[in-house]
Amino acid sequence: SAPMFHIRQNTKGCFVEIPKRLINRDFLLAARVMTVSSPNNKVKLYAGQRLYDPVWIRLKYDKEQLYLLRPDSKNLCEDTTHLSYPAYARNAITPIAESWKIEQETDSSIVVNWSKFLSEPIEGVDPFGGKTSPGRSLPQLNKILQVDVHEKNLEVSVQYGFEGTTQPFLTTIRKSLLLLPEQPMQPRIHDARVGYDNIPKRKFNFDTPSIAAENYITRFRIVPSPKDVRSYLQGK
């Protein structure tokens, strides 16, 4: 299978070729701890843990730049035909979290330099950085260790170094960018059963008018790969 992106690393940076067919598709961006020099860090994280939930993102571009969008997944308005919807939309535009200069463009793809994006902490994604930083960052220690590209995901191992208050702190973070299916999974309302984590959402209703709070359970979409569907249906 063809990789999701094509990566080229050299002395000038880490260049990512992104197919235009993936523009405006939904992605999840996440980061977890691979190694730490000590678990006695500011947020008390161990290897294998993450601090933040994965973040929903989209990509878009114009003639000069590629943009990373952070849609709001917790405030919804489903009735787009209502007369009041334009007023809601004016107060719910999608913010831009990152932008990059387009280094090269073809009919089917664009190329950007993601060196800084991949090798530095991303606010609200990386477990160490900003308010959760173990100490003063040591940029000379921040570097990309490994990049793996698959059909539907990008996996990057990154090293971060910090001065620390009493001793130096070194960590390796695994950043993941996952391409989501074009057809979203059917959500399920949370109930009182034990064992489910849930995500709160607010739904705007113009007819009432009101704002309804709803909780949806978090669950995994576990389905067979296309090549294994027949075996799955046969119970193998």
Range-by-range predicted roles:
Residues 1-236:
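Auxiliary tRNA-acceptor-end handling modules of aminoacyl-tRNA synthetases
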